[in-house]
Amino acid sequence: MPKVGMREIRRAQLIDATLRSIDEAGLPGTTLASVAQRANISTGIVSHYFGDKDGLLEATMRHVLRDLWSATTRRRVAARKDPRSRLRAVVAANFDDTQVSAPVMKTWLAFWSQSMHDPMLKRLQHVNTRRLHSNLCAEFAKALPLAKAREAASGLAALIDGLWLRGALAGGPIDTRAALKLAHDYIDLLLASD
């Protein structure tokens, strides 16, 4: 008889091992066997929980996305209620510690690449893109006409993605302070122009 709560403990252990495997070997080098080895369990257990490598990547990305959405919610709740503060909170969530570690950044890059070929991953990417745009647009719409708010949200989302991508590809720790400053300056520019 399985222990109560063991399923979630095991899944978390395997997701952590997947993040480490992608960090060390890339997505092509990440297999059910490499994940099992890092987690010190049998390949059969990995298959039992996730089915195959695609299922493992999907579960890992759902975990990373939950961390992002949790950081976004936490930071928005803690922010002052004005649009500038709440926009800055959304930006900060995208550069949260849960999103800028080497294993997570490499997993994001692998996910984006793979999402062009896998319908389930593509759907997850679309959900994430829509959620970011919706959060940004809702805040910009409090200070700008709706058409301008949509445009501003698209621009800020592109800036967030671009700053994050440049940071991820820089080969060292991401300079979150510099990224946040650029994004904050952009927000200030847009809100001042109204």
Swiss-Prot record:
The pathway is: Amine and polyamine biosynthesis; betaine biosynthesis via choline pathway [regulation]
* InterPro entries reported for this sequence: BetI_C (IPR039538), DNA-bd_HTH_TetR-type_CS (IPR023772), Homeodomain-like_sf (IPR009057), HTH-type_TetR-like_transc_reg (IPR050109), HTH_TetR (IPR001647), Tet_transcr_reg_TetR-rel_C_sf (IPR036271), Tscrpt_rep_BetI (IPR017757)
Any signal peptide, and if so, which residues? none
What does the UniProt keyword field contain? DNA-binding, Repressor, Transcription, Transcription regulation
Q: Molecular function (GO) terms listed?
A: DNA-binding transcription factor activity; transcription cis-regulatory region binding
The UniProt entry, under Pfam families, shows: TetR_C_6, TetR_N
From which residue to which does any coiled coil extend? Answer: none
In what residue span(s) does the HTH tetR-type domain sit? 8-68
What's an example Gene Ontology biological process for this entry? Answer: negative regulation of DNA-templated transcription
Superkingdom of the source species: Bacteria
- Portion annotated as DNA-binding: 31-50
Q: Cross-referenced PROSITE patterns, in alphabetical order?
A: HTH_TETR_1, HTH_TETR_2
Q: What does this protein do?
A: Repressor involved in the biosynthesis of the osmoprotectant glycine betaine. It represses transcription of the choline transporter BetT and the genes of BetAB involved in the synthesis of glycine betaine.
This chain belongs to the protein called HTH-type transcriptional regulator BetI
**Organism placement in taxonomy:** Bacteria, Pseudomonadati, Pseudomonadota, Betaproteobacteria, Burkholderiales
